[in-house]
A protein has these predicted regions:
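Catalytic machinery of carbohydrate-active enzymes
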Residues: 1-206
Length: 206
């Protein structure tokens, strides 16, 4: 059992680690080199790939994942900053695509009222599931996300991503692929407040 909690107290094997990289540490723990393998979204079920193409049939899409699952840590970036970023992306001829569940009507309505042409594909599908999010993400040019579960679903599509971090550990939780750009408020502004990250900080990376 591998865990770094309380200085590796619960790990079944006591090993001294010199890195904060969990993949490197796990390789030492298992005494075996761990290889990074990118997921191929084309191996998803064909019905989900077809559904994604039906929902997002064109190109120049940019995705946004804005809601956090756990409320105990303030990981959310202001919805108004996401709205501003989505509207600025229209200047680059990008169509904003929001990954928001159907039960978040108040958020969806707020975005619809302020972002012309914004799409909410999950609300139009009868087969919403994590795999559909990955299939939809494969149709995107870029994606912007906070640290949440959808971030990992998007990252499986292996597309350019910008991920925003505040109180959580970007080195631990950020997707491990070559297309991810990280904006960590702790490293940029020396604060855990994710709100310190500006719209232009993100826009300049798109």
């Amino acid at each position: 059992f591998y865990s770094t909690t309380f200085g590796n107290l619960f790990s079944s094997k006591k090993v001294k680690y010199n890195s904060k990289n969990h993949v490197e540490n796990l390789s030492i723990f298992l005494n075996e080199k761990i290889k990074m393998i990118n997921f191929n979204p084309n191996k998803l079920p064909k019905n989900l790939i077809s559904e994604a193409k039906k929902l997002l049939p064109k190109s120049n899409y940019i995705g946004f994942s804005i809601t956090q699952g756990n409320e105990y840590r303030k990981k959310s970036w202001s919805i108004y900053k996401f709205i501003s970023l989505a509207n600025k992306s229209l200047i680059k001829n990008k169509t904003p695509v929001f990954f928001i569940e159907k039960n978040q009507e108040h958020i969806i309505d707020k975005i619809k009222n302020q972002v012309p042409g914004a799409l909410f594909p999950e609300t139009k599908s009868e087969m919403p599931c994590p795999a559909l999010v990955t299939a939809l993400s494969s149709r995107l040019d870029h994606a912007v996300s906070i640290d949440n579960g959808v971030m990992h679903m998007i990252s499986l599509a292996d597309i350019p991503m910008i991920v925003l971090f505040g109180p959580t550990n970007s080195e631990k939780f950020a997707p491990k692929n070559n297309h991810v750009k990280i904006l960590d408020s702790k490293k940029i502004y020396k604060t855990k407040n994710i709100g310190s990250i500006t719209v232009d900080d993100v826009y300049n990376l798109i």
